């Protein structure tokens, strides 16, 4: 089953103080929903944490010496045991950098840089916003090819 086969559209959230509590439902894609939320709410700087369940997830490993991501898609029932990441800005738009850990039906762990993740049950995500902005820029030393924090 590919990530594009089933879409949900019922993400709900509540703003409590300066933070957000987000519920994702079956079929919703984590990166799309969180990016949309950040755009709509003007979230420029935040930390992300969450848990949930997925039936299709794409994570990757970045090979620093090759300056290349190696993505891998996983399908089947998975518990998302941890989503951890940040929201910053790149070119004036939200830039989400999230890592995910999950386990499959045999409780074998997978994890890496999150590219896509479709929710199969529910997703429970917290965004802790911070005042100000942090941008992104390519590694100034050219050693990694990564988009690193830019403190302007």
Stretches with model-predicted labels:
Residues 8-96, 101-152:
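N-terminal intrinsically disordered, cationic/polar leader segments
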């Amino acid at each position: 089953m590919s990530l594009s086969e089933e879409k949900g559209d019922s993400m709900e959230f509540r703003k409590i103080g300066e933070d957000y509590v987000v519920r994702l439902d079956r079929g919703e894609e984590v990166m799309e929903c969180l990016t949309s939320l950040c755009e709509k709410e003007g979230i420029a700087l935040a930390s992300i944490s969450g848990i949930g369940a997925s039936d299709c997830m794409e994570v990757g490993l970045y090979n620093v010496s090759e300056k290349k991501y190696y993505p891998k898609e996983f399908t089947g029932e998975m518990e998302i045991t941890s989503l951890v990441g940040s929201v910053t800005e790149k070119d004036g738009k939200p830039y989400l950098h999230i890592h995910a850990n999950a386990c499959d039906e045999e409780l074998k762990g997978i994890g890496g840089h999150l590219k896509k993740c479709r929710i199969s049950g529910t997703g429970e995500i917290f965004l802790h916003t911070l005042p100000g902005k942090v941008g992104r820029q390519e590694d100034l030393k050219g050693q990694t090819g990564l988009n690193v924090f830019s403190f302007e």
